[in-house]
Amino acid sequence: MNPIHFDLTLVVQVLSFLLLVYILRRFAWNPLINMMEERRSQIEANIANAEKERLQAEQIKREYQEEMRKARQEAQEVIAKATKLSEQRAAEILAAAHGEAEKIKQSALADIERERDRAIAQVQAQVADLSVAVAEKIIRKNLDVRGQEDMIEQFIQEVGELPC
C-alpha cells in the first residue's frame, strides 16, 4: 500500500454521509423541527395553563380567607350581642329581685309595726283592766298604807309577767 494512495471507499463513505445528510435535511429535518416546535408550544401552553390555574387558586384562596374573616367577624358580633343581651337580662333580673326584696322587706316591716302596735294596745288594755281591778280592790278593802303597798307590789309583778 502506497501512502499516497487514494482510497475510494473513503470517498464513497463521505458521499454516502453527505447524501444521508441531504436526505435527512430534505425529508426529516422539517418534520423534526416542526415536532420540536409543537412540543415547545405545548410545554409553553402547559406552563401558561399552570400559571393561570395558580392565579385562580390564589384568587379562590383569597376569597375563602375573606369569607372566613367575615364569618369570624359575624360570629364575634353574635357573641358580643348575646353577651350584651345576657348582661342586660341579668341586670333586669337583678333589679327585679332587688325590687321584690324591697317590697318583701317593706311588707315585713309593716307587719312588724302592726304587730307591735297590736301588742302595745293589748298591753295598754290589760294595764287598764288591771288598774281598774286594783282600784276596785283598794276601794273595797279600804286598806291601810301597808296593804296598799302590798297591792301595788302585786300589781307590778302581774304586769311584769304579761307577754310583750
UniProtKB/Swiss-Prot annotation:
Function comment: F(1)F(0) ATP synthase produces ATP from ADP in the presence of a proton or sodium gradient. F-type ATPases consist of two structural domains, F(1) containing the extramembraneous catalytic core and F(0) containing the membrane proton channel, linked together by a central stalk and a peripheral stalk. During catalysis, ATP synthesis in the catalytic domain of F(1) is coupled via a rotary mechanism of the central stalk subunits to proton translocation.
Q: What is this protein called?
A: ATP synthase subunit b
**Entry's family note:** Belongs to the ATPase B chain family.
- Which region is the signal sequence? none
What Pfam families does the record tag this protein with? Answer: ATP-synt_B
Q: Which InterPro entries match?
A: ATP_synth_B-like_membr_sf, ATP_synth_b/b'su_bac/chlpt, ATP_synth_F0_bsu_bac, ATP_synthase_B_chain
Give GO cellular component annotations, separated by semicolons. plasma membrane; proton-transporting ATP synthase complex
Report the GO molecular function annotations: proton-transporting ATP synthase activity, rotational mechanism; proton-transporting ATPase activity, rotational mechanism
User: Which gene does this sequence derive from?
Assistant: atpF
Q: Which residues cross the membrane?
A: 4-24
Localization, per the record, is: Cell membrane
Q: How does it assemble?
A: F-type ATPases have 2 components, F(1) - the catalytic core - and F(0) - the membrane proton channel. F(1) has five subunits: alpha(3), beta(3), gamma(1), delta(1), epsilon(1). F(0) has three main subunits: a(1), b(2) and c(10-14). The alpha and beta chains form an alternating ring which encloses part of the gamma chain. F(1) is attached to F(0) by a central stalk formed by the gamma and epsilon chains, while a peripheral stalk is formed by the delta and b chains.
Predominant subcellular localization, coarse grouping: membrane
Query: What top-level branch of life does the organism fall under?
Result: Bacteria
Q: Which Gene3D superfamilies did the record assign?
A: 6.10.250.1580
Instruction: Look up and give the organism this protein is from.
Output: Desulfitobacterium hafniense (strain Y51)
**Keywords from the UniProt entry:** ATP synthesis, Cell membrane, CF(0), Hydrogen ion transport, Ion transport, Membrane, Transmembrane, Transmembrane helix, Transport
Indicate how the chain sits in the lipid bilayer. Single-pass membrane protein
